[in-house]
């Protein structure tokens, strides 16, 4: 609804039906609130990706399931990208930034495992660098996010997700 940097602790407390004092009994500062929110985001996004990729028939199908789960997460929680991008613009190294770095590291590990499994199964070309494949995957999601932010409609991500992943698949797939 708002630019995260413009959201006051009074507004946060009001939305949570708390007093500002009650909010500060749980959080030492506004930055601590953002850190907790981003930790919640990280936990939920990774759980959603894990659930989506569990028991999927192949590594490439699991990558697609992860991609679609990530897109759906952003559609359900459209404030998350605004908060992330706002926080990442800050010059100082904040606890929230560290939480985002941890999220990307854990997410990247999951994706790298799927990419390596895809190479081993012959679904993905062996020539593709794993780190590059992971960066391209995350960058493709981020591109959809940026387009949806510009359009002011997070649901646009759903419409573009299948085509975006199809391009990713063609770039990474083994010729077999």
Features from the language model and the residues they span:
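Short, hydrophobic secondary-structure boundary micro-motifs
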Residues: 82-84, 97, 123, 127, ...
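Secondary-structure edge/capping motif, primarily at the C-terminal ends of alpha-helices
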Residues: 52, 88, 148-151
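Hydrophobic alpha-helical connector segments
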Residues: 36, 50-80, 130, 134-137
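Helix-turn-helix
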Residues: 1-32, 36
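Amphipathic alpha-helical segments used for helix-helix packing
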Residues: 75-95
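Amphipathic C-terminal alpha-helical segment
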Residues: 72-76, 113, 117, 137-155, ...
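Amphipathic alpha-helical packing segments from all-alpha helical-bundle domains
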Residues: 43-46, 50, 76, 94-121, ...
